[in-house]
Amino acid sequence: MIRPVSGLFILLASILPLLASPRASADDRPYDVLRHNYAPYCTPGDDLAFPMKIWGLAKDQHTFWRGSRDLLFTWVKNHARDWLDDKDAYLVTHGDLHLGNIGTYVREGQLGATSFGPVDFDDTAHLPFQVELLQGLITIRLSARQNDIDLSGPRREEIAHALYDSYRKAIASDKSTHDLVSDERQITKFIDQAQKHTYDKTLGKFTDDTGHFLRYVQTRHAQEKGLVPKEILRPAMDRADDMAKSLAQAIERSPAARAAFRYSDVATMRHSIKDVVLRTRLESVGSQGLKKYLVLLDKPLKGLDMDVVMYVKQEIPSAAERAGAIPMDPRSPGQRCAEDMDVLTNPSAYLNCWCDIGKESYWVSFKEPWSDEIELENVRNYPKLLEMTRVWGSVAGAMHRQQGSAIAAAILQRLNRPELFDQLRHRSTLYMATLDREYADFMSDPRARAEAAKAQAKLDAAKAQVTAEANAR
């Protein structure tokens, strides 16, 4: 049963795992840092929790980079003190703006209308803009490495200038993110494709014909090939009372949500819950292993005469906080995520709420078919990489510029100093060398292999069950 709790209580519950033992040091091995900073927020004994996080990180170096931001911010804390000391350069940053965290999202207004910009705000943090730019240059260079795109000769310099110049152009502009990227051919096609779907697609993906969630999310082709499911959905109706109270709490906090929902009181919310599952999405890595609930509600939204899948996602202190690069945010993690998302998106999202469940904090939205992220596998050659580099700069610049003219002026002043461009190039190279060492160490660590093996056993069992069910039909 959920009882009212103060914001201070939730904050303390969020940071106590980090205070329980000495902070991971720069000399710790990567596995040690991740176990210290991340594992305390995962359910002990659940092999689809922290072991699944380790399993995801072991996929390849690019995925390791995406999911190990604690290591980056530990490095920044020790090697970029001049940036961290530049207090006039601080603003709300996304904190994890790789290409897969850029895409379409459902915006405020008519249901199904979309905009383009940053998505997935788990790691928002108050940081100097230079740190966000550093992450951008690293992510572009690693994207090239992942897709075997040659950056020798003048290309590495050209990529760095493309990111820097597109970011500066966006900071100096008054255009929206959508307008800034409208000339990029890949993005125009991407946005048009996302708007063609109806909500039936989401229900068909996650639910059966009886008003319940599927146990596995997988295409029929993948079933026939005997592949591991893309998602595992574990029954969690024992959390239905908690979900009803948390959803009512989240909707009550948001005027936009109150306007969108037909009902928001706890009793009606509980009566309308058809099913609850705990979601594990194999392609996730940044928040892999944390609790993510899907809640099937009976026709809750105005203007949509069908059931809706709500998404209740556990939030924890950002990677920058966990690494000690910045102080702990006084807000609960769910509140930070939702409020920072409002700051970083324009127009605002259709549904963006937060709630607290016991000692945990959650971000609340809904699953829909119109949001989509850029997929790295589609960035297949140098011209496409160059285009995505400009897109990254435009998205980051618009996101930062909309926080006020004083911030924009401070950023432009620093961008006009040649030494900043040189620092970004140099520090991206230094960190990539560090990343090479850390990834090699992680992959050779027997403790990481043992954790990943626990998750793999669960996935193998799921694959066997899906195959057996397909053969029985």
Please give the residue ranges for each predicted region.
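Bacterial N-terminal signal peptides
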Residues: 7-18
